[in-house]
A protein has these predicted regions:
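Conserved hydrophobic positions within beta-strands
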Residues: 91, 180, 218-221, 254
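Short histidine-centered loop motifs in beta-beta connectors
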Residues: 57, 226, 231-234
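N-terminal low-complexity/disordered regulatory or targeting extensions
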Residues: 200-202, 277
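RNA pseudouridine synthases
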Residues: 1-199, 297-301
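Pseudouridine synthases involved in rRNA/tRNA modification
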Residues: 1-46, 209-216, 223-226, 236-303
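Short beta-strand or tight-loop elements
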Residues: 87, 135-136, 176, 187, ...
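Well-ordered beta-strand positions
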Residues: 92-93, 144, 196, 220-223, ...
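Short, surface-exposed secondary-structure edge patches
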Residues: 62-66, 232, 269
Length: 303
């Protein structure tokens, strides 16, 4: 016999989270004590030990952590903040409007019909919904699957639209590092062309401005052993496969990039990493500046 009893709806009780702005350099414990003068130190220590304090979006238990005025400190009085742990994606910074991550190589930024899940987007979507099922994540820009490094996601439609509708003015600087085959004749220089994408989704250069989109890449040699060189690359424009095409045009393809002429893949990956991301925060208008380490293999193979 069917059970006709009406089941009670499952109701979500949001976390009680409070933010305590940092106005001057101070240690975390001192800041929390000053922000909650009616609370005993033992209570604050429990919050820290139970992952209920987050600094820049990440749970923090170090009571003597040095804080700066740009830091975001939040306390969850309901339960612990989720500890984000994913070997292919690292959260570098988080606030109410944006998340900056370091993506590992081999991970899609966003899925498609064939591979909708196990992407940077899906991982972060599940993460933000853990705190509140109504939370959302929005992709603002992408990195190629085989490119590692820094990228930013929006947590609100307002942040997404402000970044995307004014991208060239909001993004102040993007710097990549790459290992290329051989050694460029000039230690530094600029590659300029117009990029075209054909019906097979292949991108290539043309000198005809009527056929493609302007792409400008500036490069500088950091170190070289003649066989491989480590380059720093700065983008004046952001086109699909821009760096890969321009290094091919320079006759020094990126190591591991067999699609654009590389002979070998000694690092067993595309040797391209988004190292620096500097932009204007879409809501606070504060300048945000993030840098990541050059992958170790990039350094060793070019010595």
């Amino acid at each position: 016999m069917a059970n006709n009893r009406q089941q009670k709806p499952v109701r979500y009780a949001p976390d009680r989270i409070k933010e305590f702005p940092v106005n001057a350099p101070v240690k975390l414990m001192e800041h929390l004590s000053a922000s909650m003068p009616d609370r005993k130190r033992t209570f604050i220590k429990q919050l820290l030990s139970h992952n209920q304090v987050a600094v820049n979006g990440r749970p923090e238990s170090q009571f003597d952590l040095e804080l700066q005025p740009s830091d975001s400190v939040k306390v969850n009085f309901t339960h612990e903040f989720k500890v984000f742990n994913n070997r292919r994606l690292k959260i570098v910074y988080e606030d109410d409007d944006i998340i900056v991550v370091e993506k590992g190589y081999g991970l899609l930024s966003m899925g498609n019909d064939k591979k909708p899940d196990n992407t940077a987007y899906s991982i972060l979507r599940d993460y933000v919904k853990w705190t509140n099922p109504l939370n959302k994540i929005f992709i603002v820009h992408r990195l190629d699957r085989d490119t590692s490094g820094l990228m930013m996601f929006a947590k609100s439609m307002e942040a997404k639209e402000k970044m995307q509708h004014n991208w060239n003015n909001m993004v102040l600087n993007r710097v990549y590092v790459a290992v290329v085959e051989g050694e460029p004749a000039e230690k530094e220089g600029t590659v300029k062309s117009y990029l075209v994408e054909n019906s097979r989704y292949e991108v290539y250069s043309t000198d005809d401005p009527k056929k493609g989109q302007l792409a400008v890449t500036r490069y500088r040699t950091i170190q070289t052993n003649g066989k491989y060189s480590l380059l720093e690359l700065e983008l004046d424009t952001g086109r699909k496969n821009q760096i890969r095409v321009h290094m091919h045009d320079l006759d020094h393809p990126i190591s591991g990039d067999t699609k654009y002429g590389a002979e070998k893949s000694p690092l067993h990956r595309l040797a391209l990493h988004a190292k620096t991301l500097r932009f204007i925060h879409p809501i606070t208008r504060q300048i945000m500046d993030f840098s990541s380490r050059v992958p170790g293999g990039f350094m060793s193979i070019t010595r």
